[in-house]
């Protein structure tokens, strides 16, 4: 069930991600409070939705979000763990909230007024078969016409994303199509 409307691939460090944010004219100050995973997902979603001609202030009750990665929220978990150090025990609530990997889905949904279901899965590696199946699960809800999906990873200061907007055209999305976007 699906036709790719738009997609992007990003592989960058935190500084370049901020540059992308500025070049997109996002004007979303909350971006600077987010963890790296959420920043990467938000920028990738912005690129994909802008390419598709969708405005972030229009409600999207017919769209869902499906994201996958390998490391869950490990990047931010490490930072949060540092705030628990015995000699400096001041856990940061702003770090804690991002120790949940599905927060990136919520950030994307809030920014873009996506009102459908959001799902985040952790897989050992990118699996186009799993992604195609998860897109199918989202389209099982007859109200959903679009799925914003992707692989969003953050490890060792690098963020990488493959994000795509899939439209339900009544045919199954081929795993090979998703694989070609990931490369």
Regions found by a protein language model. Name each.
Residues 1-144, 148-183:
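Conserved "HGTGT" condensation-loop signature of ketosynthase/thiolase-family condensing enzymes
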């Amino acid at each position: 069930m699906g036709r790719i409307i738009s997609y992007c691939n990003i592989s960058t460090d935190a500084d370049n991600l901020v540059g992308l944010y500025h070049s997109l004219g996002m004007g979303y100050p909350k971006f600077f409070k987010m963890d790296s995973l959420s920043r990467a997902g938000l920028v990738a979603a912005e690129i994909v939705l802008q390419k598709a001609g969708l405005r972030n202030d229009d409600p999207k009750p017919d769209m869902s979000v499906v994201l996958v990665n390998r490391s869950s929220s490990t990047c931010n978990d490490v930072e949060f763990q540092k705030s628990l150090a015995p000699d400096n025990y001041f856990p940061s609530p702003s770090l804690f909230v991002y120790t949940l990997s599905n927060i990136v889905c919520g950030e994307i949904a809030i920014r873009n007024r996506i009102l459908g279901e959001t799902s985040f899965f952790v897989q050992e590696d990118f699996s186009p078969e799993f992604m195609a199946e998860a897109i199918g699960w989202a389209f099982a809800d007859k109200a959903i016409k679009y799925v914003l999906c992707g692989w969003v990873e953050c490890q060792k200061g690098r963020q990488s994303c493959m994000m795509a907007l899939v439209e339900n055209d009544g045919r199954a999305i081929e795993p090979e199509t998703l694989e070609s976007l990931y490369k």
